[in-house]
């Protein structure tokens, strides 16, 4: 449906499943996405500022609020806000500040540390 809708638009390319999402993300200045845990974690690890689109109540909203609170993302409720934030981020120093905040909040050994804590706890009981 999207391919048909945008078939005449040279500025839009619709991709299906891709094995090389990391490459697409690394070549991006900003990522517009839902606030799912895996995607925003990948963006954090890749240091790509986020525009989180219309997060649903629950985990997505909490993820979005956390990233916004720490100035690592903007939350857009509609397409107009997405465009506003893209223009804002690409024309100001905001995007660099978001990248700095992402570097500060990224914990590269988080999984390892969690496993170590669990093993330490299990050894103590």
What is the predicted role of each segment?
Residues 1-125:
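Nucleotide-activated sugar donor-binding and catalytic core shared by glycosyltransferases
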